[in-house]
């Protein structure tokens, strides 16, 4: 993915990052782009904050798009996927 243009008078982020819509995948993408910008700046704490913001954006996406699914449900599936990759098999 192409990184945004460098902004003239930066705040936290030195690249232009389009604003997403709360509850939509565009907000998750915004947080990913902010994470990448933090990494480009070698800003460890900022990167961790962006990861936290990403979790929040995912929770709001679920509330908006899949109200019966929780972040815990996603974590269960994530752990199962990790197990499958670790063991080298999907069946």
Regions found by a protein language model. Name each.
Residues 1-91:
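Flexible "arm" and connector segments at domain edges
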